[in-house]
Amino acid sequence: MEPGTNSFQVEFPDFSSTILQKLNQQRQQGQLCDVSIVVQGHIFQAHKAVLAASSPYFCDQVLLKNSRRIVLPDVMNPRVFENILLFSYTGRLVMPAPEIVSYLTAASFLQMWHVVDKCTEVLEGNPTVLCQKLNHGSDHQSPSSSNYNGLVESFELGSGGHTDFPKAQELRDGENEEESTKDELSSQVTEHEYLPSNSSTEHDRLSTEMASQDGEEGTNDSTEFHYTRPLYSKPSIMAHRRWIHVKPERLEQAWDGMDVHAAYDEHQVTESVNTMQTDHSAQPSGAEEEFQIVEKKVEVEFDEQAEGSSYDEQVDFYGSSMEEFSGEKLGGNLIGHKQEAALAAGYSENIEMAMGIKEEASHLGFSATDKLYPCQCGKSFTHKSQRDRHMSMHLGLRPYGCSVCGKKFKMKHHLVGHMKIHTGIKPYECNICAKRFMWRDSFHRHVTSCTKSYEAAKAEQNTTEAN
């Protein structure tokens, strides 16, 4: 008789979920917990086995270090971590739309890649969520940031005015408090979903408040013009033009004419339109006229650049594209970038003069080199655009793909260097021995050694001829 012939196999499909549910109840009641996680002073009790099974980060902490107390960085939001901890026990994760990037960052730190994949899918399917997150600041910006208290306050106040996050110890009184916490989170998500058509007035009020807190537009502009920054450009190795916000009436000016006189006439038309739209619009000052002239110059310059290079052009991997990273080209590009930065600085100064905006950082005594735009990973940036590019690294976007092998890259120059492998082009040639090289660093090393050998041989030949 074969072993196991008379055995019976019985399965309980919901047994694992029931065990996790009971473990979660024990966690909330503070029973049999063997590890404490500290997030910004908030202490969360949990079980090592559950944490190690759900997160490789916690697995390393409890197995390799045998830690009973784990302190997470202050950049992590306690509310976000509590929901992720609850997810480890229940398998359900409720993510408010404005905080998806916060969940993505926290899951990346905890190495919970299944959560990272889900957050990435949500962001790819709803790009407006990331635009709102990047435009209105992260949840952990310092008070020195111009976007501080923007989205966080509106989110917390919208949930009923509960601005203080409850301590973890206060959530251990039983299953009833767990249900109340779920109801509170559900109400927060419900209030920040897309509003129905019959509540358009409330939606407009929230949009106006969020736009006014951004600090980049005046009072009238924040209520009349709403724009979003392009999130993702089509994969291409062509140099795309920079994104510049041009208001509707000024875009019409760029189409009608490019000379200063036409700009002045259309400015008068714009003035009359603004007067009809609102009774509180101010009369244009000399600074505003100067601002429009500078803006016109910027538009003309970008139009000229667009005429010089089209998106439909094919990249020459055999010639100029390889030389654009040489020392001469690099120096020219740096000078050009400095000139563009100076022009952009003058552009911003005219905006502030026309709209009467004063930077809050000047009152706090910050200099121009202060990094006012922090990321949740701990890094800070001087300009908002730099933080936006940094966020794309967290998302793992690789917009530049190789048409031959399909490999994708985060930077354009990485793709250009990769194409040398497929084309076999060796653009660097030694003037002494005519040997060619594919990579510039190898070429420079060879030139150094080859020059020394050539000079030594030439000196020896001169000595022989002299004798």
UniProtKB/Swiss-Prot annotation:
Which ranges are annotated Polar residues under compositional bias?
140-149
PANTHER family documented for this protein:
AGAP004733-PA, ZINC FINGER AND BTB DOMAIN-CONTAINING PROTEIN 43
Modified positions (N-acetylmethionine) in chain numbering: M1
- Keyword Acyltransferase in the entry? The reply is no
Q: Which domain of life is it from?
A: Eukaryota
Residue segments, region Disordered: 134-153, 162-227
The UniProt entry, under InterPro entries, shows: BTB/POZ_dom (IPR000210), SKP1/BTB/POZ_sf (IPR011333), Znf_C2H2_sf (IPR036236), Znf_C2H2_type (IPR013087), ZnFinger_BTB_dom_contain (IPR050457)
The UniProt keyword set, sorted, is: Acetylation, DNA-binding, Isopeptide bond, Metal-binding, Nucleus, Phosphoprotein, Repeat, Transcription, Transcription regulation, Ubl conjugation, Zinc, Zinc-finger
A Pfam match is: zf-C2H2
Localization per Swiss-Prot or TrEMBL: Nucleus
Give one GO molecular function term: zinc ion binding
Composition bias of kind Basic and acidic residues appears in: 164-174, 182-194
Task: Please identify the protein, giving its name as recorded.
Answer: Zinc finger and BTB domain-containing protein 43
Q: Where are the zinc fingers (C2H2-type)?
A: 373-394, 400-422, 428-450
BTB domain mapped to chain residues? 33-97
What interactions and quaternary structure are annotated?
A: Interacts with BDP1.
Q: Which residues carry this modification: Phosphothreonine?
A: T423
Q: What does this protein's UniProt record list under function?
A: May be involved in transcriptional regulation.
Cystine pairs: none
Q: Which family does the UniProt entry place this protein in?
A: Belongs to the krueppel C2H2-type zinc-finger protein family.
- PROSITE patterns recorded: BTB, ZINC_FINGER_C2H2_1, ZINC_FINGER_C2H2_2
Principal place of residence: nucleus
Q: Where is this cross-link: Glycyl lysine isopeptide (Lys-Gly) (interchain with G-Cter in SUMO2)?
A: K182, K247, K297, K358, K458
